Amino acid sequence: MTSTAAEGAGSGSLNPPHSNPSGDGGPRIRSPPGKGNKPVALADITNTGKPNAARSITVPDLVKENTKLLTLLNEKTKIIDLSRVEIYKLRLALQASKQQNLHLTQTNSQMLAEINTGKDRIKMLQHELSCTTALLKVKDSELDRKKNAGNVQQKGVKSQVLKTKASTVAVEAHHVGDSVTSGVEHHVVESQSAVSSNTVCQEPPQDGKQKRMPQRRRSSRLNQGSCEIRGVSQNTLHENPVVPVAPSTLSLEKQYGQTTGKHMKSLQNECSATVHEVIMASEFEKTEINELPQKTDLKEIPEACSSETEVQSHKIGDKAFNSKQNHLTGSQSSLSFNTVDTPEPPEDNTVKRCSKKRSSIEDVNAKLDTITSEPLRHEEKRKSRRKISARLNSVSSEHTDIVVETEHKDVIVSLAGSTSNVSMEQRTNQEQDGDCFSRKSNENQILGRRSLRRAAEKVVSYKEMPLNVKMRRP
């Protein structure tokens, strides 16, 4: 290295000898610049410059140059070592950065996974929340429906209990009014028979068209609370001018004094007392019904109402019919034989009416005790009484019906004020209970009556007739 450096330094410091172009040891002619390897011409030979003087190369110069080169080499080696250290440091930093990058990527991936799981969990929680809100709404609606249904059931039970109470009160009041009217009618018939003992009763010609309605329908009319009796046509009244007209209540008061009015007032007071007792009994029954559980079948209530109203109405109708038959037979005997009856004093009649009133009150109390316990027994009694009333209907005659109807008109007018309210209430109650009665008619037929025998109906399906059958001659 040193030899080469010295040679380089010597060559760099000294000018090299020019080459001789002629080749005989002399200075050579330089080729003109830019001509390359052209052959030397005469101009070039003749115009040659003077050669430079050769320099002398010394040893100290070479040593100096060598030392300079050594210093440069040392510096370069130092720079190389420093660069190596720096490169190593950079490699270490790169590795550390790579590791940090890996850690960061891992943490980033973990965070992203946690975020995704959190989002999914939020979605699930939102779905659960929506489902729970929907379930709560459904439960609230069900609770509201149950509350409304319970309120409706309570209202229906209350209304039906009120209807049953009103119907029972109206029926009992009508029964009491019927008993009172029957006593008054009996008194009027006796007085009229005594007055009209000397008169002659001419029977009207019986026509086939004017047939009397059955007594059964008449008893049903009395059950409705109306004391109306089928009136006689104007023709029959004009044809029978000899038939006596029943005296009014004013004439009775004139004949027997004002004792009858007092007795009527006492009877009305007793009627109001009995009605009050019936109302108290019905309220007691209402309290017992309210103590029952609210989940009772609502279908049993209208059936019981209809059965009770049927039993009471038929029982009252049968009693009214029996009393009417007794009055009819009494009046018929008095009119047919033209016997003279002495009128009884009003005190005996009032005693009779009081006894009848007491018996009717006892019947009312007995009914209230036996209606709920023995409904089937009442139905059997009603059937037997219906049969008896049907037999009695066949025996009664038309003429006695007409006479008694004309006799009862004035008495009914006098008592219409006291029984009009009861009749109106009972009519409305029976119109409301008509539907229940129509529903229970089939069940009553199955229980007590003979079942209807219907012919088997042949079911024929429609089929198209073939053409050859259509074209046949009849």
Swiss-Prot record:
Q: Where is the composition biased (Polar residues)?
A: 12-22, 190-201, 322-341, 422-431
GO cellular component, alphabetical, reads: chromosome, centromeric region; nucleus
The organs and tissues expressing this protein are described as: Highly expressed in tissues containing meiocytes. Expressed at much lower level in leaves and pollen-containing flowers.
**What Pfam families does its record include?**
Shugoshin_C (PF07557)
| This protein's record includes keyword Cell cycle | yes
Q: Where is this region: Disordered?
A: 1-53, 189-226, 322-356, 422-442
For bias kind Basic residues, which ranges apply? 211-220
Alphabetized UniProt keyword annotations = Cell cycle, Cell division, Centromere, Chromosome, Chromosome partition, Meiosis, Nucleus
Main location group: nucleus
**Keyword Nucleotide-binding: yes or no?**
no
Q: Where in the cell is it found?
A: Nucleus; Chromosome, Centromere
What processes in GO biological process is this protein linked to?
Answer: cell division; maintenance of meiotic sister chromatid cohesion; meiotic sister chromatid segregation
Q: Which InterPro entries match?
A: SGO_plant (IPR044693), Shugoshin_C (IPR011515)
Q: Member of which family?
A: Belongs to the shugoshin family.
Function as written in the Swiss-Prot or TrEMBL entry: Plays a central role in chromosome cohesion during meiosis I by preventing premature dissociation of cohesin complex from centromeres after prophase, when most of cohesin complex dissociates from chromosomes arms. Required for maintenance of centromeric cohesion before prophase II and correct segregation of chromatids during meiosis II. Has apparently no function in mitosis.
Name the record gives this protein: Shugoshin-1
